[in-house]
Structure formats: C-alpha cells, structure tokens
Amino acid sequence: MSLSFCIIVKNEESALPQCLASVRDLVDEMVVLDTGSTDDTIAIAQSFNARIYSFDWCNDFSAARNESLKYVQGDWVLVLDADEVLVPDVIPSLRQAIRSPHHLLINLVRQEVGAAQSPYSMVSRLFRRHPNIRFTRPYHAMVDDSVEMILRHEPDWQIGYLPDVAILHDGYQASTIAARDKFAKARTIMESFLSDHPNDPYVCSKLGALYVEMGAETQGLQLLERGLRSIQNQSQIDAPVLYELHYHLGCVHSEKNSLQAEQHYQLAVQQAILPKLKLGAINNWGNLLKARGDLLGAKALYEQALEIDPALAIAHNNLGMTLKALGQFGDAIAHYKTAIDLQPDYAEAYQNLGVTLLKVGNVAESLSAFRHAIAIYEQTRSPEGDRLRQGLREMGFEL
C-alpha cells in the first residue's frame, strides 16, 4: 500500500524541516499546499522533494485541506500540520495498519507538548484515499463527518486506531499561541461557523472552551451548556465530544461549585474513550478532592492517572503533595523527583520538593531545590520566584 503525505503551510520555515523529516522515510510522496508563504517555506519543501501547489487562503482550513487532497496519488493519506511531528516508534505499527483491507480510517493519538492538563487527543489524520472523504469545519478541520456518511452507504468499512502516541504537537504552547495570535484567528473562524450551525456540539465545545481561556467565562459557559443539551438530544452520542463538554464544564465550575464540577468530571471519565484521553478529567477530579480534604480519594485518582500514563509529570507532583499531606514524606519526595526527571523545568515540583525536604530536616538539599525553583520562575518571569525568595528570607534563608 502506498502512502501520501499531505500538508498545508504558510510561513512555516522554523517548524517545517522537523515535520517533513519525521515522515520522509515512511511516505511515498509529499504534497505541500502553500497558502501564501513569504519566507523560506517553499524552498524547504523543495529540499525534501515535495510536490508544491498554491492556494489562495480563504479563512477556511477545510477548503485548503480538500484542495491538497486533489493532488495525492497514494492508497492512503497521512495529514500533519507543520507544528507536528510523527513519532518514529509508531512507524512500524502505522505501516502494518494501512495493509488492512478493511479499514477506512485509522485514528492517531496526538500528544500536546507542554500541556499539563489534557496532554492527549485523538485525531483522524490517517485515512484511505476515498473519493468521498472530505474535510469539514473551517477551523478544526476533520474528515469525521464525511467518514460517517460513507459508513452509512458502505457499512463494511472499519474504523481503527493506534493506541500509542503517534503525533507530537507543540502549537498550543503559550509562546506559539501568542506569536501567531491563534486564539483570535480561531475565534473568528469558529464564530462564523457557529452562526450557521448554532447547536453543533463540537463547535460549542471548542469555542466555549476558547471563550473561557480568553476570559469570557459567562459566554463560554453558556456555549458549553448549549453543546451539552444538543448532544444529549442526538440519537447517537459522540463520546469524545461529550467527554470534552463535561471536562470543560468541570473546569468552569471548579472555582465556585466543586460538587457540580465533580459531577462533570465523573461523567467525563465514564465516557467510552481511550483512557489516555481521560487524564485531564481524572487529574482535575483529584485536585477537587484534595482541596476538599479527601486525601485518600485524591490519592486514588492520581494513582489511576499514573497507571494510564506513568510519565505524566503533573500527576506525580499532585500525588507528591497528597502524600506529604498524609505524612508520607519519603514517598512524596520520590514522586517530586520523578516529576522533575520527566519535566526538568517544573518549578512547582522543585518548590514542593524543597518544602518536603525541609520538613524532614534535609536543609542543604532543600535549599538546592528552592534555588532551582527560583531560577525557573525567573526564566519565565513568574512572580512566584520573588514570593518564594521572600518567604525563605522570612524563615532566615537568604538565596
């Protein structure tokens, strides 16, 4: 089976080399659709022997992606964004997956690099070249809607997934979002789509969560609740979207109504989706219980998160705080150190480690941990560095 790689780009000279290099040894052809680059994007694509086409940007990612599909020639299509890379370890299982004569679509697990709360998502980026597969939705473009229509008429096709992380994505790191004004672009495009599809649960979830992140909490809450009402009225529930709605509603309510937030997190965790995708709700549910004083309940949830993903640094840090509160200082220290090993720039874990080491009388190692925490806080211009330094000064420690 031949595999085509498809990507749309504009001014991606910094990210594109890593993206194309990650798929070079896997795919049979590269199709690059440029939407108006003024930097070295096209030259970089040419250096990878990609076939390059141009498209006038029309504020619609689906339109651009569908244009790129016109040029692919392989039996299967793999789609990435320039700020994504394919994980090398997944290549053998990906090759095996596209040999299946029964599958129309293979969903892939994507990891959001630097995301603490919801590090994983499932994306429909590997699919058979079928004349009726098309992208829909102008911002979060996906083929799911067209695949659903195909299955109604060709029910013998199967949908599969690869359970291991296949894609690494760094486009939602704070620096990238700020540099590209991603929030404003996403808001404009999704609001336009919402005006024509006011009760679409998926866009209600995505745009509602975006409103909350931008500080428009009331507007976001209303949209999330609308999405929840809409999806509950559907004959066939989309479990991943229902999870996201409950997860985001839990986040909104967590500050003012912990019981309502807990109900939403519980319902999110109950959805029939890949366990990795539930980590955000499991971790946040644990935070609610910890804040309420239910330390054993919180401990169980953090341990559940680590059973799913032993490399989840935030769960190690949160479990460390819970164990410290339970008086299990040695175990707490071990989890803080694991969190730091997994995420060396984890200032909060260093700070928590310092507090616990001081508690057990290990002053020298404690001060070393505090110095690391302060240095990281200062690198990120966080006011927590000054607060920590002042707190230590009041205790008689001058760092």
Tell what function each PLM region has:
Residues P201-Y202, S235, Y243, P275-L279, ...:
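Helix-start (N-cap) detector for alpha-helical repeat units in TPR-like alpha-solenoids
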Residues D34-Q46, W57:
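A conserved acidic beta->alpha catalytic loop
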Residues L69, L86-G215, Q219-Q222:
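Catalytic-site signature of metal-activated, phosphate-bearing donor transferases
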Residues E213, S254-E255, A291, A325, ...:
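Register position in tetratricopeptide repeats
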Residues S205-A209, E244-S254, L279-K290, I314-A325, ...:
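Conserved alpha-helical positions within TPR/SEL1-like repeat arrays
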Residues V77:
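Short aromatic/hydrophobic "clamp" motif used to bind/position activated sugar donors
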Residues F193-D196, L228-E244, Q270-L279, E378-T380:
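Flexible helix-coil transition and linker loops at the boundaries of alpha-helical arrays
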